[in-house]
């Protein structure tokens, strides 16, 4: 449990006095002494209480500190600091500040008045106001003269603040002093810079002035809560290091490839050629000289003065498309862009976009690749490169977009999401612990005060009874109830006690039928700090009733006076008649039918608002305004009557009612101010009524909840984002503002500031916001052009990386986390929703009753018995069973016992006892809260008996169920419905049941044909029942069996797949050139007939084989049937000559669906499609919700901009007339009549009605074409008036708001919903992957089990001396590292290449490259010599070998290869793959390896999705070819990018897959009449006339493609990457990963050179020391190795598995993980070594150590024994020498080693020296010379040697005379 706070109550606050300081000193001494005495048994070191950290709010449990204690030093509340010199100060807002109790600056003690005064000032809010006002001044682009004075004032205030901080805290010595807080470094720096810039002249002042901007960061230090978010951001940036490195590496490799492929290509332009003297500069197509190759030389040599370079560099001689700033690019390869007649393709001039877009050097190539990765304006680069290099290079972009853009960018998202998730879980865990403590505290209080204070349960009628729910209540729903935190009047969070709703007459909760007080778990997720942490409990001492009351006071949101006021004025209970009237009103207003009526009114009102358009007739306008009045009246009446029925006190306790009241009030205000100019904005508030639908629409409700909760939780993050945006906007303005003004002519032809500039704060803010949207490159070019490349790159990249990649991904991570788990359980406060369903239920019940009555009457009239229908009823009921709408599963938990549940279930009105509504049946399709059980499912299996009976009652003919018949699910696509579920279904899945998604694949194949027709058919037409055992029936049966055999044969299926592919391929040839290729056309027509015949035959065969029943119950067969029908109809029409009919033509375009038949045949695609179909209900739901959400913005757009986008243009120059010439439409018409050169036109994408508004919003949300819409809006004035430049500037804000809410939230919601849905499907399948086929799953598992390797037998060292030396050389790690360094150097030499390098540099680089090739060839040769045939057993070696051969071939044959293939330099790029090997050598690269591992694991699923995406692109491109092949070439459609041929279509669609440039391709298709296009234009080579588009088809085509590809399929890609990243993270998040085991094996191989799997025990210490972390056991390691208790085999050898397990155990400890690891390692080992040497351990290291110890003990004992004997003998010798020996005394030691040694020592020969050695003395010999007798096993014999030292120790020195010994 989390740390328990000290006892609550105000008694805790004590002044900090000298006595307190003395007490701290005393405690400090005591702890010091205790530490010196020695550590006690191990216990966790104490940690500071997180609730009492400096900067946090004081936990509510302490109550309100008395006023006299605020802002004064108090003793520290946190027990952790009791022995440290600190004190705390609590501010008025109850924020805790902690100070150091040492004298500040060695002068001011904590009790000095100066310091106390400083503390009081320090915590004042003045500083915040100063910072904000300073920020306002910084936003001024032209500050007034007096601003300098203000600047001094600010500097003064900041200096004063810093001084106060230093006085109150101390400067830097000791904790909690000024410089110990990193945030104060910021202050220190800002102040220092202010003084430095003031007194020292430092040149570039504007750059230094930008330092002042950092003051805005000071807001972070002042606002509580911001610091934590910033910490989280820094945390996620740390986590991103690996991704960043990988990204930079990948981009570098791609940039090198780009450099080699496209260097210099983007400078190829169309130059007017040949030069003709009489040719004017402005006649691009009028070339007078024949365009032949000799022209070049003729002109050059005939005109000596002609300057070729100047001519081609001159822009007048280059070909420009109208309206384009850059010359048209071209290329010289066959599929590159062509030049118009009279022009030649040459390399001239600078690169496009001011020269910044190119692949001419590594830096620019890297920038281009970064742009591709972030997908900003990448379609332009794509088109430019393809135009210059050729269409085949599309492949390069495909790889970069899929690997670079989709993978790396989403990896960043995955990392940020993971960092957020980890923090989130930590805070949730903490919250849970606090919750438990709080419950425990309440339990204690309750037990103490039970008798007097609290009743056990609230009585039903009491008005304010409170029930304290204890933690051990049986209710599973407990957590829901306890987790909500309420906000009090001051906006602080406090925990909530469960208020039981009073009964029917008095309850607010029940008035809104079930607006319960239980909180959603959702709030738990994000109320991180305050509410949850304040639930901390205390070690309850004896607490009085006062404490309980105080605690309850703390729980109540507002001061008591408010409650008195509310009870007096907001509860209207006066006289009896009023009460009766009120009850009557309540009865009517609360009736479900009224709710239904109100909902219908909301829908109608929304429709009325959406019907507004331009131009509108007066009658229509009048009708709309009357409608508005009526609806306003209805809603006002509803509010008024509800107020009467419920009393304001209860009415305003329900969120929806507050919402209603606000909208009604605004609507009434708007009616009053209808004619006031400029207040039309109020009309927009009516739109919020749409949100009332959320009451009855769970998904919308959920979306609003998610946005609400995210915005709540994002409060701080949003602030941080706002600060970042502000800082960068000011930085941009200060750094570049002046440059924009001074150098404006470089970027604008009129020398006026463009729309995007940084000259003032608002525009600077817009640029920063645009970068956050992901559009940075265009503004950066302009910035680089006016202010230089360096600073612009730095600033823009910082905004991009910090703002876009980190902060916005944190937003997204937060959104995704809102989906996790069941925190969005629909059905907590959906009482209103239930009313709606009750109403619908009543209606349907009425309808059913009427229907039954009619049927019964008819049957009676027909004379049938009445019994029959009644008998059939249950069957029908049964058939409905699988699709019944279930009770919301949450409600099954609400009542504790099953019986109550049954009763509730049966109540016809649907209202449960206690006023809690139970029927929670979601409305929208696919919304059920729990999944639908199939008929075979026994739902009740695991439930309690009582509950199961209840369930059965529900399953039976329950009247409720009849009532909800209307709402039943529509089965989706027959067999594929298994995946239906709500967007965020909260169903808790049981372990996988028999029914799974892949049901149809799993079923065993029938061996015989099934019945042809259903039983019902046979019943109605008896003739269909044929006897198959005889006659014709038998022949028919045999025919069916034959057909069945054919159809089931593998070859048949293969043949059909082949035909499908051929017929699909045939469609690709039907392009605009088909009429010119007669042969191809004839072949295709013939093939079409053949295909149709084959497919019809296949269909008939399947009908006969499977029967109609089986065929038509399979969704895939229906698809086949539909597509074959289309082919048949179009073929018949062709034969009858009707092919030119409109309907037949459109039917022919449907042939594009043919490839869909491939779906069911390719398992990979089918798997993905099944998963998608499962997600369709959710995706549709979110789509609908998005549409509703966008509807508001669309209607608002129509209100603001309808008819205002029209403008008058000059038809020759295509430019706008200024207002001075043309002010409005009539002026324009006058000019048109006079000159024919004016035209009153509208912007193609506009807001003239809601439909067009939606298209505009889609363009804004995808950030494509949005700038044009924005410009039109910002320039708009009034209807039929000519627009003026930025006259309506603040309309930008509409777009900013829509982008944040409409684009950001709703589009990212798609990702959330898709990921959530796939996770649900996975859970259904028992956590199997839903995007992979069985084969691919095997690959995936193999990837995961990469590490099941045993130590390999190392490559044997060659016996040859020279080979052996080479072998030793190349085996060293040094050699590997050396080669890696060379590869990196090689990469660097490739990087320094540029397009315009000098011949010397080129020559030098060529030589360097040759040198590298020589070195790498040498490496290869050395390895070949040393490794011999083993060289080819390693994949890397083969790779190196191939690269070397390619490099040599490339250098030798470079000219030949370049002529026919790609540039040979590309082979060198391949070598970069070897850098991958570095990753193995760098220990720190584990994170990067994880990321690559995640990619490897994602590959199979990504391949399937890629296939599906290609299929979709194929179908759409065929469709595009048949519809848009002839549209006018303008905007995004030109000679290369169009729908004329299949290749061009695919290129266009690939570009749109990322939503790139789709607005430009759509524009020409929106042309439908002259003068925009020409419907009578002849298209050469075909009979199709005109070049107009079809706007409706075009919009449908693009919107559907964008939704399918960009929003769904691409997001599936994201879902998979996130999923696999988590898996890879788990794998690598383990303490050990495969790499560690690999490292273990490699080290083992060095010690066990023979590959025996054993090493000597003596080697173990060195081996364990040689291992790398985390497995390493560093020396000295003897004891630890002995503790490991390793088994030893004969010869003191140890087996590798035992060592591996032991070192693994050291890392993991005794955990479950370790047990699993042990099993898996042993299993892998046994699997890999079936014939392994059986090793029987004879002892273990511990046993061996014990034996050694025992031997030592014996040795010591024997030594002591000898010692004593030695002393005896020495004394005897001494006595003998001095002659004091008794005659009868014998020598103690007559013989043996002791006697002999001592005799020698004392200079006298011992007697009997030659005697046999004593049996006590073991023979002295060293191991090898000892005889053959080995010691017995398990017995260690240690020879005891008697050394001279020992004897010397026991004998006295000769020169000392001893005194006489006393006897």
From Swiss-Prot:
III repeats: 1032-1346
Ranges per topology, Extracellular: 141-147, 201-206, 263-361, 387-393, 612-622, 677-678, 732-760, 782-792, 1070-1082, 1135-1142, 1199-1250, 1273-1289, 1393-1403, 1453-1465, 1520-1541, 1565-1594
Reactions catalysed: Na(+)(in) = Na(+)(out)
GO MF term set: calcium ion binding; voltage-gated sodium channel activity
Ranges of compositional bias, category Basic and acidic residues: 28-40, 1780-1794, 1804-1814
Membrane topology classification: Multi-pass membrane protein
Glycosylation: residue positions: 204, 278, 291, 332, 1210, 1224
Protein name per UniProt: Sodium channel protein type 4 subunit alpha A
Organism: Tetraodon nigroviridis
């Amino acid at each position: 449990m989390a740390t328990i706070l000290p006892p609550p109550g105000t008694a805790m606050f004590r002044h900090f006095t000298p006595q307190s300081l003395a007490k701290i000193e005393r405690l400090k001494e005591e702890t010091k002494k205790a530490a010196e005495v020695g550590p006690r048994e191990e216990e966790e070191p104490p940690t500071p209480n997180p609730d009492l950290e400096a900067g946090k709010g004081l936990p509510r449990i302490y109550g309100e500190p008395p006023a006299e204690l605020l802002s004064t030093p108090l003793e520290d509340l946190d027990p952790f600091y009791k022995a440290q010199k600190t004190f705390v100060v609590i501010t008025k807002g109850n924020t805790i500040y902690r100070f150091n109790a040492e004298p500040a600056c060695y002068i001011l003690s904590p009790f000095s008045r100066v310091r106390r005064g400083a503390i009081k000032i320090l915590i004042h809010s003045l500083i915040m106001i100063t910072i904000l006002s300073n920020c306002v001044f910084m936003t001024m682009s032209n500050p007034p003269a007096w601003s300098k004075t203000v600047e001094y004032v600010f500097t003064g205030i900041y200096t004063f603040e810093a001084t106060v901080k230093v006085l109150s805290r101390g400067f830097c010595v000791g904790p909690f002093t000024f410089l110990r807080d990193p945030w104060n470094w910021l202050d220190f720096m800002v102040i220092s810079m202010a003084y430095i810039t003031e007194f020292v002249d430092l040149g570039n002042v504007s750059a230094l002035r930008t330092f002042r901007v950092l003051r805005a960061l000071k807001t972070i230090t002042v606002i509580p809560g911001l610091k934590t978010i910033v910490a989280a951001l820094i945390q996620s940036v740390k986590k991103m290091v690996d991704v960043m490195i990988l990204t930079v590496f990948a981009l570098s490799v791609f940039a090198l490839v780009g450099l080699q492929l496209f260097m210099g290509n983007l400078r190829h332009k169309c130059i007017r050629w040949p030069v003709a003297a009489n040719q004017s500069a402005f006649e691009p197509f009028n070339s007078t000289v024949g365009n032949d190759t000799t022209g070049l030389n003729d002109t050059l040599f005939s005109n000596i003065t002609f300057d070729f370079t100047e001519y081609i560099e001159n822009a007048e001689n280059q070909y420009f498309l109208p309206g384009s700033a850059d010359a048209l690019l071209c290329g010289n390869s066959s599929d590159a862009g062509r030049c118009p007649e009279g022009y030649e393709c040459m390399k001239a001039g600078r690169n496009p976009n001011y020269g910044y877009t190119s692949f001419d050097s590594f830096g620019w190539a890297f920038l281009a690749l970064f742009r591709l990765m972030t997908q900003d304006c990448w379609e332009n680069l794509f088109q430019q490169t393809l135009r210059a290099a050729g269409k085949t290079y599309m492949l390069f972009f495909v790889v970069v977009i899929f690997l670079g853009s989709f993978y790396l960018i989403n990896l960043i998202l995955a990392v940020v999401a993971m960092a957020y998730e980890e923090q989130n879980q930590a805070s949730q865990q903490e919250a849970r612990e606090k919750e438990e403590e709080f419950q425990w505290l309440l339990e204690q209080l309750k037990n103490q005060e039970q008798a007097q204070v609290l009743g056990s349960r609230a009585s039903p009628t009491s008005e304010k009874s409170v029930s304290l729910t204890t933690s051990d209540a049986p209710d599973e729903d407990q957590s829901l109830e306890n987790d909500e935190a309420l906000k009090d009047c001051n906006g602080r969070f406090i925990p909530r006690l469960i208020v039981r709703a009073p009964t029917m007459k008095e309850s607010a909760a029940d008035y809104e039928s079930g607006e319960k007080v239980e909180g959603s778990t959702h709030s738990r997720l994000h109320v991180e700090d305050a509410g949850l942490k304040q639930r901390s409990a205390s070690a309850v001492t004896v607490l009085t009733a006062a404490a309980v009351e105080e605690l309850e006071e703390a729980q109540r949101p507002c001061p008591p006076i408010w409650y008195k006021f509310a009870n007096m004025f907001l509860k209207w209970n006066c006289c009896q008649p009023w009460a009766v009237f009120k009850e009557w009103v309540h009865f009517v207003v609360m009736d479900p039918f009224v709710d239904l009526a109100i909902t219908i009114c909301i829908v109608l009102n929304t429709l009325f608002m959406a019907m507004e358009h331009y131009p509108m007739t007066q009658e229509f306008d009048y009708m709309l305004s009357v409608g508005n009045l009526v609806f306003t009246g209805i809603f006002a009446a509803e509010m008024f009557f509800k107020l009467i029925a419920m009393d304001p006190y209860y009415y305003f306790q329900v969120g929806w009612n507050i919402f209603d009241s606000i909208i009604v009030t605004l609507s009434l205000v708007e009616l009053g101010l209808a004619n006031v100019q400029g207040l039309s904005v109020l009309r927009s508030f009516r739109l919020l009524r749409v949100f009332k639908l959320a009451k009855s629409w769970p998904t919308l409700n959920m979306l609003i909840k998610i946005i609400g909760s995210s915005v709540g939780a994002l409060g701080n993050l949003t602030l941080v984002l706002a600060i970042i945006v502000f800082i960068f906007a000011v930085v941009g303005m200060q750094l570049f503002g002046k440059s924009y003004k001074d150098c404006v002519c470089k970027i604008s032809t009129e020398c006026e500031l463009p729309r995007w500039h940084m000259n003032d704060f608002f525009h600077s803010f817009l640029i920063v916001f645009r970068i956050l949207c992901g559009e940075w490159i265009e503004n950066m070019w302009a910035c680089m052009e006016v202010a230089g490349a360096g600073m612009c790159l730095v600033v823009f990249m910082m905004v991009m990386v910090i703002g876009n990649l980190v902060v916005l991904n944190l937003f997204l991570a937060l959104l995704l986390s809102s989906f996790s788990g069941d925190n969005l359980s629909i059905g907590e406060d959906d009482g209103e929703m239930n009313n709606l369903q009750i109403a619908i239920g009543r209606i349907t019940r009425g309808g059913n009753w009427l229907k039954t009555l009619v049927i019964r009457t008819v049957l009676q009239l027909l004379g049938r018995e009445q019994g029959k229908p009644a008998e059939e009823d249950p069957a029908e009921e049964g058939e409905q069973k699988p699709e019944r709408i279930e009770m919301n599963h949450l409600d099954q938990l609400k009542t504790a016992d099953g019986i109550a549940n049954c009763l509730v279930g049966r109540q016809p009105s649907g209202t449960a006892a206690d006023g809690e509504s139970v029927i929670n049946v979601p409305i929208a399709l696919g919304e059920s809260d729990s999944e639908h059980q199939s008929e075979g499912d026994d739902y009740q299996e695991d439930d309690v008996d009582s509950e199961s009976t209840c369930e059965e009652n529900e399953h039976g003919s329950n009247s409720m169920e009849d009532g909800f018949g209307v709402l039943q699910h529509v089965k989706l696509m027959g067999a594929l419905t298994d995946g239906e579920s709500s967007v965020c279904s909260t169903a808790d899945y049981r372990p996988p049941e028999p029914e799974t998604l892949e049901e149809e694949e799993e079923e065993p194949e029938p061996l015989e044909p099934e019945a042809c027709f259903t039983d019902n058919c046979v019943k109605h037409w008896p003739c269909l029942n044929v006897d198959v055992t005889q006659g014709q029936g038998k022949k028919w049966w045999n025919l069916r069996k034959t057909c069945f055999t054919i159809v089931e044969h593998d070859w048949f299926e293969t043949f059909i797949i082949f035909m499908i592919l051929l017929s699909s391929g045939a469609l690709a040839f039907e392009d605009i050139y088909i009429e010119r290729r007669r042969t191809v056309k004839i072949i295709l027509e013939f093939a079409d007939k053949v295909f149709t015949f084959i497919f019809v035959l296949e269909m008939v065969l399947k009908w006969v084989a499977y029967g109609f029943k089986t065929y038509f119950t399979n969704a895939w067969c229906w698809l086949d049937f539909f597509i074959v029908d289309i082919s048949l109809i179009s073929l018949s029409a062709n034969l009858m000559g009707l092919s030119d009919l409109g309907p037949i033509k459109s039917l022919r375009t449907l042939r594009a669906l043919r490839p869909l038949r491939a779906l069911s045949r390719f398992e990979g695609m089918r798997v993905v499609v099944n998963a998608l179909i499962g997600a369709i209900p959710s995706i549709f739901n979110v789509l609908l919700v998005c549409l509703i959400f966008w509807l508001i913005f669309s209607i608002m757009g129509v209100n603001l901009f309808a008819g205002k986008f029209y403008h008058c243009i000059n038809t020759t120059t295509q430019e706008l007339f200024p207002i001075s010439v043309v002010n409005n439409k009539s002026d324009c018409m006058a000019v048109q009549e006079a000159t024919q050169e004016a035209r009153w036109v509208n912007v193609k994408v506009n807001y003239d009605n809601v439909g067009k508004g939606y298209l505009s919003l889609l363009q804004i949300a995808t950030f494509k074409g949005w700038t044009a819409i924005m410009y039109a809006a910002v320039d708009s004035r009034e209807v039929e008036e000519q627009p003026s430049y930025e006259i309506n500037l603040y309309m930008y804000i509409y777009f900013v708001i829509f982008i944040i809410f409409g684009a950001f939230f709703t589009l990212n919601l798609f990702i959330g919903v898709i990921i959530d849905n796939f996770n649900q499907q996975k859970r259904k399948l028992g956590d199997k992957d839903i995007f992979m086929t069985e084969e691919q799953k095997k690959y995936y598992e193999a990837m995961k089990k990469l590490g099941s390797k045993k130590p390999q037998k190392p490559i044997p060292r060659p016996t040859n001396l020279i080979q052996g030396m080479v072998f030793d050389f190349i085996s060293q790690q040094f050699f590997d590292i050396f080669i890696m360094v060379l590869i990196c150097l090689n990469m660097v030499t490739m990087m320094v290449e540029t397009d315009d390098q000098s011949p010397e540099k080129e020559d030098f680089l060529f030589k360097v490259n040759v040198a590298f090739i020589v070195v790498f060839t040498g490496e290869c040769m050395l390895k070949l010599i040393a490794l011999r045939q083993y060289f080819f057993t390693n994949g890397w070696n083969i790779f190196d070998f191939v690269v070397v051969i390619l490099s040599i071939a490339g250098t030798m044959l470079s000219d030949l290869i370049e002529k026919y293939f790609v540039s040979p330099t590309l082979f060198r790029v391949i070598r970069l793959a070897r850098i991958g090997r570095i990753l193995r050598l760098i220990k720190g690269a584990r994170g990067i390896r994880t990321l690559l591992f995640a990619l490897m694991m994602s590959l199979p699923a990504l391949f399937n999705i890629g296939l599906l995406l290609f299929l979709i692109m194929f179908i759409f491109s065929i469709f595009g070819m048949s519809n848009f092949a002839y549209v006018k070439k303008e905007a995004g459609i030109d000679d290369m990018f169009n729908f004329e041929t299949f290749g061009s279509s695919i290129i266009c669609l690939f570009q749109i897959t990322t939503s790139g440039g789709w607005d430009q391709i759509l524009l020409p298709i929106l042309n439908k009449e002259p003068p925009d296009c020409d419907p009578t234009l002849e298209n050469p080579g075909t009979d199709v006339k005109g070049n107009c588009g079809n706007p409706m088809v075009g919009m449908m085509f693009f919107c559907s493609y964008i939704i399918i590809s960009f929003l769904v399929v691409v997001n599936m890609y994201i879902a998979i990457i996130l999923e696999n990243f988590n898996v890879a993270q788990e794998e690598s998040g383990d303490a050990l990963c495969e790499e560690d085991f690999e490292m273990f094996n490699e080290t083992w191989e060095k010690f066990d050179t023979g590959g025996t799997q054993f090493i000597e025990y003596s080697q173990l210490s060195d081996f364990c020391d040689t291992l790398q972390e985390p497995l390493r056991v560093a020396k000295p390691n003897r004891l630890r190795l002995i503790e490991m208790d390793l088994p030893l085999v004969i010869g003191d050898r140890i087996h590798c598995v035992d060592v591996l397990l032991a070192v693994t155990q050291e890392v993991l400890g005794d955990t479950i993980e370790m047990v699993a690891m042990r099993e898996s390692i042993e299993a892998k080992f046994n699997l890999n070594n079936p014939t392994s040497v059986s090793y029987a351990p004879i002892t273990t290291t511990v046993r061996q150590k014990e034996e050694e110890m025992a031997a030592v003990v014996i040795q010591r004992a024997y030594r002591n024994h000898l010692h004593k004997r030695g002393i005896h003998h020495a004394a005897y010798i001494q006595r003998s020498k001095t002659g004091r020996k008794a005659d009868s005394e014998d020598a103690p030691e007559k013989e043996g080693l002791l006697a002999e040694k001592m005799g020698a020592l004392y200079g006298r020969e011992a007697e009997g020296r030659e005697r046999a050695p004593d049996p006590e003395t073991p023979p002295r010999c060293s191991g090898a010379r000892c005889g053959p007798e080995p010691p017995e096993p398990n017995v260690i014999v240690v020879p005891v040697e008697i050394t001279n030292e020992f004897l010397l120790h026991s004998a006295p020195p000769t020169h000392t005379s001893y005194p006489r010994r006393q006897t």
